Amino acid sequence: MSHGPLRVGIGGPVGAGKTTLTEKLCAALAHRCSMAVITNDIYTREDAEALMRAQVLPAERIRGVETGGCPHTAIREDASINLAAVADLRRTFPDLDLILIESGGDNLAATFSPELADLTIYVIDTAAGQDIPRKRGPGLARSDLLVVNKIDLAPHVGVNLARLEADTQAARGQRPYVMARMRAGVGVEAIVAFLEREGGLLLLPQD
């Protein structure tokens, strides 16, 4: 019996690189499994439109949800708008293996309802400062995978990368993390391996 597609929540502050991560995962996986994306924006469908422009997935496999108000409510306390989008995608594409659910930009406290996401990936931005891992919000400390993005910017913003990674390790304990440069595709392979290992995602072999 099928349990339906693996649902992966992608969260993190505005500008951390969530949409870039979503785009890179689509580019890496769209030819290896049946997948779709749901994006959450407060008043627009900007992220969904950005993915459509990038042409990483057919437009009909991308749903843009306008959350209004606080974006974290739509992924946690009242996930009904996202659950409806999941149900719609499953009706349209019964063979789905993977749905990526990108939250609207939010703070370190954002978490996904377990009803909505099987796994959660949280993205932080190296340029946001040295102390981000030490703030240890639930998204950063308890997500299934943490992505520390834009590590190439560290020398330009006065961040000591070795210390940032040590603080990240301390905040995460045994939970995995990836040091990444999403725009250049650095870290994408490790994230794909995580989805296979922890989510049981079955992929066709690479061409």
UniProtKB/Swiss-Prot annotation:
Molecular function as annotated in GO: GTP binding; GTPase activity; nickel cation binding
Keyword Cell wall biogenesis/degradation assigned: no
GO cellular component terms, semicolon-separated: cytoplasm
InterPro entries cross-referenced by the UniProt entry: CobW/HypB/UreG_nucleotide-bd, P-loop_NTPase, UreG
Sites where the protein binds GTP: 12-19
Record key words, sorted: Chaperone, Cytoplasm, GTP-binding, Nickel insertion, Nucleotide-binding
Keyword field contains Cytoplasm: yes
Coiled coil ranges: none
GO BP: any one term: urea catabolic process
Places the protein is found: Cytoplasm
PANTHER family to which the protein is assigned, alphabetical: UREASE ACCESSORY PROTEIN G (PTHR31715:SF0)
General function of this protein: Facilitates the functional incorporation of the urease nickel metallocenter. This process requires GTP hydrolysis, probably effectuated by UreG.
Complex and partners: Homodimer. UreD, UreF and UreG form a complex that acts as a GTP-hydrolysis-dependent molecular chaperone, activating the urease apoprotein by helping to assemble the nickel containing metallocenter of UreC. The UreE protein probably delivers the nickel.
Family per similarity comment: Belongs to the SIMIBI class G3E GTPase family. UreG subfamily.
Name of this chain's protein: Urease accessory protein UreG
